[in-house]
């Protein structure tokens, strides 16, 4: 099992180097331009201040930049950190919704992935922009502006069956979430469907999950203020995702959110309609909005987190590994990132 952290703040690159020293395997840079630092700047600095940790996006959003630009960006980072970069690609839940826009649809996203994949493989590919199609490829490779000689893995973000199938069809890996991406067996079944559609084998395919981890202190309960502060922002990020999903698709919310669902909708709908989309995602994986703390109940913590004492968390992680999970990512509140990553490294990773 590999473990990854998330670095999103341009002036705290030392956190990524610290995670490397603690034994973490990789680091994501997030791509939410209205609430975080620019991911490519973060990765460029991290590449120069680290030696072994793998670096990439979690996730680079298709709707924010042209596919050739995204391919160039990660290939440029690969020039600084050859052989230890990857690119995670996604349709853009938070990044697009903070602009009041929907995520990219699956069909254009699949085309986006196809172009990025071909360019990073050094291939010529037909590229369409504004209705005009031309063949394109990276040029002047001998001048070493970028590096595509060292392979760059493409991981596809997918919480639903179509995106998960697309990962199997075009990706080198899947990035999903627990629980909002469904169970691991369900996700893997979707991946295999996509691979079968493309006639691909899934050799070296990597499954990564964004997981909310919560380590309890001796005698601590799920109602403690420390617990709520530590896991609250991650739990509410999942709630925010579901609010948009249910609104747009009309599907029923999952059972695990039922205890707070209507109360949260009433709270959210009372916000100013013109800026509601901003308020919903402002705290995204960074801090717990004090007005939302009341929704972080023991029932919600149990539904959204791998929680327990170290030996209990280790047992649950091993169970996920047995189901086919290869890597775990987690995102800590900004003001606790050093303490939580250190504690997890010493009490969990070191014992696995």
Segments from the language model and where they lie:
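Active-site mouth loops of central-metabolism enzymes
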Residues: 1-10, 60-68, 148-159, 213-216, ...
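Glycine-rich, proline-tolerant flexible connector loops at the mouths of alpha/beta enzymes
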Residues: 26-49, 61, 93-96, 178-181, ...
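An alpha-helical appendage that flanks or caps ligand/catalytic pockets
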Residues: 102-145, 189-319
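Conserved, mostly hydrophobic/aromatic
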Residues: 23, 46, 77, 116, ...
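Alpha-helix-loop-beta-strand connector modules within alpha/beta enzyme cores
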Residues: 40-57, 112-115, 119, 344-352
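Hydrophobic faces of well-ordered beta-strands that scaffold small-molecule active sites
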Residues: 3-5, 27-29, 55-58, 85-89, ...
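N-terminal beta1-alpha1-beta2 module of alpha/beta enzyme domains
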Residues: 1-58, 152
């Amino acid at each position: 099992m590999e473990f990854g952290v998330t670095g999103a703040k341009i002036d705290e690159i030392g956190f990524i180097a610290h995670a490397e020293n603690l034994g973490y395997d990789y680091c994501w840079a997030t791509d939410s331009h209205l609430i975080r630092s620019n991911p490519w700047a973060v990765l460029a600095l991290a590449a120069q201040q680290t030696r072994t940790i793998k670096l990439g996006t979690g996730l680079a959003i298709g709707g924010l930049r042209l596919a050739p630009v995204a391919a160039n960006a990660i290939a440029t980072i690969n020039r600084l950190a050859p052989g230890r970069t990857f690119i995670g690609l996604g349709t853009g839940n938070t990044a697009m919704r903070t602009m009041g826009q929907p995520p990219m649809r699956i069909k254009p996203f699949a085309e986006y992935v196809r172009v990025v994949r071909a360019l990073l493989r050094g291939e010529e590919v037909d590229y369409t922009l504004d209705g005009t199609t031309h063949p394109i490829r990276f040029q002047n490779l001998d001048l070493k502006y970028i590096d595509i000689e060292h392979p760059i893995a493409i991981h596809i973000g997918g919480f639903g069956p179509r995106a998960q199938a697309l990962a199997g069809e075009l990706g080198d890996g899947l990035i999903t979430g627990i629980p909002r991406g469904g169970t691991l067996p369900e996700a893997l079944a979707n991946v295999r469907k996509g691979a079968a559609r493309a006639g691909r084998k899934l050799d070296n395919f990597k499954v990564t999950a964004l997981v909310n981890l919560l380590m309890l202190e001796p005698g601590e309960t799920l109602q403690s203020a420390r617990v709520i502060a530590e896991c609250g922002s991650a739990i509410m990020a999942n709630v925010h995702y579901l609010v948009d999903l249910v609104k747009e698709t009309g599907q029923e919310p999952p059972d695990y959110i039922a205890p707070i669902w209507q109360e949260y909708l009433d709270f959210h709908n009372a916000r100013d309609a013109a800026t509601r989309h901003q308020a919903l995602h402002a705290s995204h994986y960074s801090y717990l909005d004090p007005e939302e703390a009341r929704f972080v109940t023991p029932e919600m913590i149990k539904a959204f987190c791998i929680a327990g004492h170290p030996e209990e968390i280790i047992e649950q992680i091993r169970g996920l590994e047995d189901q086919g999970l290869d890597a775990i990512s987690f995102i800590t509140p900004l003001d606790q990132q050093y303490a939580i990553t250190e504690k997890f490294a010493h009490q969990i990773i070191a014992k696995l």
